[in-house]
Amino acid sequence: MSSIEKPCSASCERNREPILAVLTEYFPGDRRVLEIGSGTGHHAVHFAAAMPQWQWQCSDRAENLAGIHSWLEEAALPNAPEPIELDVASGNWPDDRYDAVFSANTLHIMGWEEVQALFLGLPNVLEHDARVVIYGPFNDDGRFSSDSNAQFDQLLRGRASQMGIRDQAAVDALAQRAGLQLIASVPMPANNRCLIWQRIR
């Protein structure tokens, strides 16, 4: 795949710097990072280039791997290996363990059963003191944080009934069952947030 065919994401271009600021705070030092749902691969290249001490492992469903590969091939970063196939619903988690997990704009695309499968599988790939950062829009006790998020949720559910903005408390309940403790909820531009968990067991 040539560089002309690289998949692009305008939202990644807009949010990559605010997200990087959060990651550099909560992923200090050398980290082996697993990105779940790497999408285009845009974030991976930007973050791996900015933080060479991180080993950034992309993952996604099989149909997205070629696009991710095109970004990684062009960037040729020594700390960003080939993407691996990961479909959380199928349970094909990698055998490796990671110090950190990152995922952006995935929970509202996944069905709720897939979100549950994600957190059920996380302990299998997390080191004992790992951190997890998930970026995206979230509700609070069923309430939308903005009119634009309510409109976005309606758009998502129009595309597929299983999609939709998730409630932070419901997601955190899954995280707690996976042995994770919420240590921060960082407001982000465009009515998004970064939720940060620490593995405690």
Where are these predicted regions, by residue range?
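Class I SAM-dependent methyltransferase SAM/SAH-binding core
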Residues: L34, H42-G91
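Core SAM-dependent methyltransferase catalytic element
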Residues: L180-R201
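Class I SAM-dependent methyltransferase Rossmann-like catalytic core
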Residues: M1-G29
